[in-house]
Amino acid sequence: MSEPPQIKVSISLHQDTLYELETAIEHAAKSNYNSITIPLAHRRFEREFVQEPLKTGHNRFTRSDLLLSSTQWLNRVICRLSCGVDCDSEDDNVRKQGESTLRQELSYAEHLVQNGYILLRLKSGNCANLARVTTVGLKGVLLVEVPMVNPKVAQANWRSDADYECGADDTWNWWNNFRSYADFDTHVKVALEFTADIPEKREIYRWLGEPVDAVVLSSNIFLTNANNYAVLSKAHQELLVLFYRTFGCHFIVKANPDDKRLVHYADYIKYILRSNYKKDPMQGYDDLLEIPLQPLYDNLDSFTYEVFEKDPVKYILYQNAIEEALRDRVPSSEIQTRTSIIMVVGGGRGPLVRAALNAASKSKRMVKIYVVEKNPNAIVTLSALINELWKDKNIELISTDMREFEPPEKADILVSELLGSFGDNELSPECLDGAQKHLKPDGVSIPCKSTSYLNPCMAPKIYSQIRSMEKSLHAKDRIVTSRYMEGTYVAYLKNAYHIDNPQAVFEFVHPNLDPIIDNSRYKTLRFKAQLDCVMHGFCGYFDSVLYKDITISIHPFTHTKGLASWFSMFFPLTEPVQVRAGEEIVVNFWRCVASHKVWYEWNITAPRQSHIHNVQGRAQPIWK
Amino acid sequence: MSEPPQIKVSISLHQDTLYELETAIEHAAKSNYNSITIPLAHRRFEREFVQEPLKTGHNRFTRSDLLLSSTQWLNRVICRLSCGVDCDSEDDNVRKQGESTLRQELSYAEHLVQNGYILLRLKSGNCANLARVTTVGLKGVLLVEVPMVNPKVAQANWRSDADYECGADDTWNWWNNFRSYADFDTHVKVALEFTADIPEKREIYRWLGEPVDAVVLSSNIFLTNANNYAVLSKAHQELLVLFYRTFGCHFIVKANPDDKRLVHYADYIKYILRSNYKKDPMQGYDDLLEIPLQPLYDNLDSFTYEVFEKDPVKYILYQNAIEEALRDRVPSSEIQTRTSIIMVVGGGRGPLVRAALNAASKSKRMVKIYVVEKNPNAIVTLSALINELWKDKNIELISTDMREFEPPEKADILVSELLGSFGDNELSPECLDGAQKHLKPDGVSIPCKSTSYLNPCMAPKIYSQIRSMEKSLHAKDRIVTSRYMEGTYVAYLKNAYHIDNPQAVFEFVHPNLDPIIDNSRYKTLRFKAQLDCVMHGFCGYFDSVLYKDITISIHPFTHTKGLASWFSMFFPLTEPVQVRAGEEIVVNFWRCVASHKVWYEWNITAPRQSHIHNVQGRAQPIWK
């Protein structure tokens, strides 16, 4: 067995009370903790704001900043706000006391840690004022601590006098209220406390859609095994690994500072994570937004070609598809006499030509290849390849747009790779409709069919990224425009919750034998939410039949193994839509076609009516 | 009885089919109709888009524009789009045929009438594609014809095989879907068809909140009275008057062109409207948005002073209040010996001084008046009044801010008029807290208490106005910013539906005897929707006790008769909230106070969570 990789795991030791700051940091460090999580206010100092102006009381509620250097404050300490206050109390005095306490603490916490972490424990979903007081003008990260399962629910199992509202018992709703009131502020993240009880799988998946930044583990969820070691249950171990894989989150361990097993907890967590570590080949791309390519309108650059040519799977599948098509079209008896005409439309820097040559060689079929490419920069590469590497091959290079190409003969096989993350979004239908006239009546197109898929999803991280693209003269203004909120994006969506399974949207078949070709489409899809959640938009995928049973797919249920060329598509909604468990989600999707552009429009008609997004392609036209 | 006023009523004659355009216009004019409403497409010309390109069929589907002049097209004709098509059919061919038909007609209609009217009849709430096709890039007004009561509902009373969804039977939902999909486009308005059945009152009130531009009357809702005249039922007459008063709408009469009573219908409608006409003294202000004044921060100008001084009621009530206070403070036995000190804080151009002088004279009490005014321009007027008109009165003019004023003696009565539409929004609490130190221990403040009120409301017209304030480089962009959507406005709200009754929000008492004065406030209010509706924001009002039982109020249930100085306040929500009948609406309202400004924040927590509006007063601070 190979040595577990030295991945970086950051663990903070949570202290209920604190006597001596430097000693505590030293003690935690010796026990293999990177930092300590401490109450910001010192217990000894009671505060009374109503009777006493802040000025005189200010220096007395906590310790001095001079105890540590700025770097130590930032890296070694997570400040925790008082949780004994109630900003949402119906009693005005209690509420005002809470507001003043938290404002004072927040101000001091930001003084100490600048852009660092501040921890706030959430105790209910009645938190509008709390959200207002604690999130205004945040500079650092407000870690909102939420238990995975409401302690009252556990209680309710054996107590009948417990009073909690239905729905309000779900701690996700606490968090959802808080961050909705805070307008999905990117500075607000989750510190999710693992509880002894583990919720249903779908509830865990919903948490995976949230911006979880830390996992909180209490020493009391550790079990003692036969060897007297503290261990986590199998289920808790799996959770730990799952959250670390999704978020690369850090950990906060709640334990008594005198607990003899302090070192063990830290080492055990690291051990579990390291021994279950799997490198994600797409690491680094997580939830990063990209604008979909428009290879038809823009000429791709060398860097982009190179990235796509590196796909370990795609061109092998193309090669297999061409090989099978060649075998089907030319019986063994004719391999010496019959030459198949292959047209590669959109040759790029030659990967499909290479696939076609390999297919010909493997199937021992004779081929003549026409390579059509409109990008003059790619033509340079193709010419060089043909003149040097492929000079003994029967290849003709044509520098033109495939829609205007006038070949001297008709093709047996038309090969193209104009597929985008949503199938038709790089305009393969429009291109292939133009090129298919050069196909023999029995000729085949590779790919011969592509289908797009959609599902509604909760993706606050993506949503916040899009929102933050809005430029504003005044940083405090809230700006939402169609320019960003109605665009479409490509992203490796990791931190997202899929509200329902994908459904097919549009289908395109090549060659298209309809008497009048119309590539506009309109489809209504109906989904259902299993849990309360927030819908931020729709994830899009595609699959494509290259030839017979050879397909490529980024549909999550049928994803081609190793295929790396496409991330999912994301279609945002202008404003997040709060959805209740059991509610139906009805979405309309249009593919619109005009003389010089193609675009998608979308809106929802349930659970509530939305305006139509990307009207006339105002945010994102795809130029023909 | 006086002659009914010659109000302008515009009536169009709706023609099912049309043979000769000019004749028809002439015939209608002779029957006292201003215009005719005609099908845009000519029945003789069947259209088939799928088989035939538009170019060749284009000139054949309707009549030529040369038949009339542009002005005639605009003023004499309302074009009606085909209603035999179905843009939301599940059958792709039917849908595409519908799209092409309507696009062609719309294009031609806009060619004919430019910014004029185009009529479209709505037949169901399944209209996402219809809304998309007919509202994109609208230049004119799209009149969406909707029956007040669904004909199927009437049918269902005696047929059991009628199939319609529950909820979908409400034609308001058809309209609401349509305009929600069309993003509350200001170009889209309602042509409401009065049906024989009249819905419940609250449903009628909901329609009064919508942008109704025309009322459609079919000849078959006319009854024949004993004298063989066609008349409307009393209920229909009342509806007619109500809608005309609210909207000044025009009318479309559906009748057979050969109907002998054509002239009578037109004359009858005009007769009903004229004989029930009541001039609204506020006419011209309807639903116009104004930014609330900040008289503390900005110096009011002469025009504004003049407008407010014209209020026929306000200063009489002030005078009465001062008079009663004088009588209470100085018994008859002391009227020769005791002089009451009145301080008018915020003297403006003197109306309160005048009220105080009148009160003194009427009560025969002696007064000394200090007039405090910070606006140097108003000081000019006040000096002139004191030196000329009031030179024998005991009046001292002090040119300063009332919060800094240091008077030589303490006052019996402190009179001010710093009230805004939401009571405290012109900072009366802050001002009076500063001035009240000059009051004798038993002195009184006029006003002595003010209370603000709120209720949720549907006000698409106001909402659209606010939305259209957003400036955009590209007219097609959808832009929503806090700058406008989180501001507060003052408006004479006529075209609005009040979702629930107002409730009290904040209360301020003067003088404020709290040991520590805190003018920040936080209140949570709970409302309930009786009908499906859309919430665009909250209407705000106030009432104020001047002295004892003398009050001024703009609360709709207790509105002081004739009081004209204040319109309602409007607090918008960033995005309209679709509300279902029976749903609870929970809103939080904050009054926030900082060293140099005061502002309101608000959000809703039910039926769904909204972000907090006007955070830190980003859209609308009220400067101290």
Regions found by a protein language model. Give the residues of each.
Chain A
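Class I SAM-binding transferase module
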Residues: 1-314, 320, 328-341, 345, ...
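Pre-Walker A adenine-sensing motif
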Residues: 324
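Conserved SAM/SAH-binding loop
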Residues: 348-349
